[in-house]
Amino acid sequence: MAHNQHHKDTIHSLFFNPLIESYPLSDSPFDCPDLSDLDFLKLGVSRCMSAARSGNDFLQTYRKDDESRVRVSNFFEALKSPRRLANLTSVNALLKPYMADHLPDELAAIEELKNWHLYAGDGHYHKAAVFDPKTKANHSSKEPSKSPTGHFFRLDLRTQHLGYLDLAQPDDGKKSEHDLKMLKRQDLETLRGNAPKGHKAFYLWDRACIDYGFWAKAKAQKGIYFATLEKSNSVTTFIREFSIIDYDDCRNEGLISDRLVESSAGYEIRQIVYIDPATGTEYRYLTNEKTLPAWVIVLLYKHRWDIEKTFDETKTKLEEKKSWASSRNAKKMHANFICLTHNLMLLLEHHLHKTEGMKDEVEERKQVTREKTRHKGTGFRKNLPPSYINRFFQRASQRTFRFIRWLRDGLSRRTSYRQSLRDLAHTWGCPVP
């Protein structure tokens, strides 16, 4: 991709540079004179970054790169556009290989995971839009009310790229859609993430994904695997030990057993029992994957939590809690803009660390304090050093309030690159580069 020679003029131009580099390869581009695709993409991300309470509030002060305003009608009409949605979706998809090229992959250190595409998946809900209709659940005596907007996302565990799967489609009279119903609706190639031939996809999902027949089909047809936690009411029958745990290998600390069991429906499933050395909490994992070591599956599932932390980032720190508009396209657009914003923040933060040598020293000091006061279990567990699984990832699972507030200010004021670095150095408590 061509390098933007002027990407360091302002923090605004640096932040949007990956988007500008990716756009020429995107699907369904169109040169709209009133609101170009790039202006629209920047507009949506800026809306996510803004502290404004509504779209009208945001548009009253927003200016495009040429200092012109965006009409309210233009913005909300653009949110309905199927073509713009296709373009936005493809740009965010293009950021996935872009992030793989630019961000570190801590999981690359695990040789067994070569050629694996690793995802944490989950649903997340927003409050209904202002003009969403009220509905009444079937056979309910309650007054009609608005339904929340449900979205399903996947987080790439290698790069933390956030991708969008689908909008929830609740049955008539219901307020939400079951995760499994959404998964079954997807094209299997989409779930593979268009992984190359010979590669495999692995989903870490919560208990809502359990349907052994569906995952057997996904595995047989497209090389898609899953792991989840066992339900408390699951009925399984022991078949045989799958592997013997080698306790001389520090990576196996906490593993109790690795077995094959039979579900009540007759499916052979791998069951891994693990006790967290730090807390003594027992976990039982179920998976249809039979080539990876048990410790790898435990490690991956432990970091399924990263997608929950990402939702916290978007809801609590970006304050994206409510749908922007009522149309299905607009709701999907909103979710894709949230993904794009998260991904651009990750790229900018890494650039500042790698290129400018900047790091959040305030957060590092807070982490030390948290570690001292964090509950570490009782008895002998209090003095145990962190296990291999518990200390593997060093990366942050979300961006801090300090970073987001600094970025929000720099984007709105179009602060110069050098001044932005000075402001961030003050915020992070680190030297000015």
Regions found by a protein language model. Give the residues of each.
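Short, amphipathic alpha-helical "recognition" segments used to contact nucleic acids or chromatin
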Residues: 40-52
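Short, conserved catalytic/metal-binding motifs centered on acidic residues
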Residues: 43, 58-59, 70-76, 116-126, ...
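Short, charged amphipathic recognition helices of the HTH superfamily
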Residues: 49-64
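An internal, acidic/charged active-site-proximal segment
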Residues: 91, 167-281
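Active-site-proximal, Lys/Arg-enriched surface segment
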Residues: 76-157
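A conserved active-site cap/scaffold subdomain adjacent to cofactor or substrate pockets
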Residues: 280-307
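A short, flexible helix-boundary coil/loop motif
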Residues: 1-26, 32-34, 243-274, 278, ...
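Short amphipathic alpha-helical "interface-anchor" segments enriched in bulky aromatics
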Residues: 297-325
